[in-house]
Structure formats: C-alpha cells, structure tokens
C-alpha cells in the first residue's frame, strides 16, 4: 500500500495503519507525509516488516514512526526489515520505534534508521531485543530508561493505576481504559470476560510473564512498585555521536550487563548518558561514506 497525506482534520493518533488484537501484520507499505504516527499496534504476535516510513510526525512531537505502549503483556511483537528515515518531530522529537511507558517484549531486528531524533526508544520496559540494526544520523541511536523502577510519584502511581490492572485483567480492547471499566474489572474477570497474564494461553506461551507477579504483590493502594528495565542489545551498527542514552534509577546508581553488575568506566560511559549529560564519541571523518563492507560485523 501507498499511504500519505492522512489525518488532515484530526492530527494525532490517526495513523496510516492501526492494529489492535493478535497476529496481525503490516508488510510492504510505503507511508509518508503524515502529521503524527505511521503505524500503531496494541496486542500480541504482531509483525511490522518490510515497510518504508519517512516524513511522518511532521506536525507533532514525542511520537514515533512506529508506536506501541503501556502494557507488560504485549509479547511476540516483531519490528524488522524496515527503512525509517527523515522524520519530523518538534519538542521531544520523533522516534523510529517508540516503546512507550514500560511496554515490553518488542523484538527489533534488521531495521535501518536515518535522520531522526532517536532510532529506538525503550521507555522503562523489559525483555526487549535490539539486534542487527543500522543507525545513521540519530542522536542517540538507542534511548533506554528505567521509568518503571523510579520512585517518582508520577511513575510509581502509574504503575499501580495502569500497568498492574493490565497484568491481572487483560482486556478485549487493550487501549480502552475508562475509570468505569477499571472499577468493573474484578467482576468481569469472574464472569470470564477478562483473563490474567498468569492464565493460559498467556502464561503458557509467554512464561516470562510469571516474573512480574513478584513485583505486583503489593496492595492496590501501594505506590512503590519497582520494575527495572531490561534489554538485549547486540550486533548493531552505530554511526551517530551518541550510541546509547541511558537514564537509570537514582536510588541504585547501578549498571548491569547480561545480569552482572559492571563498573561505570570511561569506555562504558562512551555509550551511556547519566541523567541528561551526553558523553559523545569522536566521529571519524571517513564516515562520509555510510556504505558497509561485505564482511562488516556490528558492535557486539
């Protein structure tokens, strides 16, 4: 499909493709000249592959060419083999792939990002995979934070109010979340309208969801849930000055690599930003040619 110049009357959250449910695919689409997001998805086992997205987020900011958010139970979603380039974005800018507010589990492989604010944004979630991507003129290439673990009252209350109910009461329409609906969930769960992440088929297909139960054992009125971020990032190619921008929980000041605590050395901090202070790498003048040699191996 060729999709362009949409959302003329209502600019926000009217993407070219909007997928809600399970097992849908957005494949071989050319989407451009949109005021906001190109592709949005909510659910499980979604695939966004082989698309070219450019000149989107032209009249808005804090948005992504591809967007999903706010649910730990979204699993099996893959974004791969997409060419995402030359985005707009005002204020907070435009992201290539925007994983918002602790959504988790997105697999992002073999994408090419060029000329945008952040290539991949992971907003406090867990179980991400970022492999074999190329980042050109994105600063930073990858942004990752621990908003799910911060003690700040805005995020800690949000964890209890939004994320905890979506773990125990998986709704038929995951982005519908009125106050009335939330208050009625417990009754509907017993009537079979809702399922829990600990029930089949969720826990059977995604056994990693069981780990979240430990974090959600607090009572409903508590506001101190802590869910640290986690991601596998490997074999990517970084051209930008800043490869990673990472914001951690100020109460721990700890970095981990593959489950082991690591010291914040100068070499490591070349790829990490601590609370907004960029530590930038030197760009080789030879990088004017952005083609890769046939035997090029990405950063481990």
Can you annotate each of these PLM segments?
Residues 1-39, 100, 171-176, 182-195, ...:
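Long hydrophobic alpha-helices with heptad-repeat/coiled-coil character
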Residues 10-20, 37-43, 61-71, 90-102, ...:
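Glycine-rich beta-solenoid repeat tracts in large extracellular/virion proteins
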Residues 14, 36-38, 75, 80, ...:
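Aromatic-enriched hydrophobic runs in primary sequence
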Residues 151, 155-224, 243, 251, ...:
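Long intrinsically disordered, low-complexity regions that are acidic and Ser/Thr-rich
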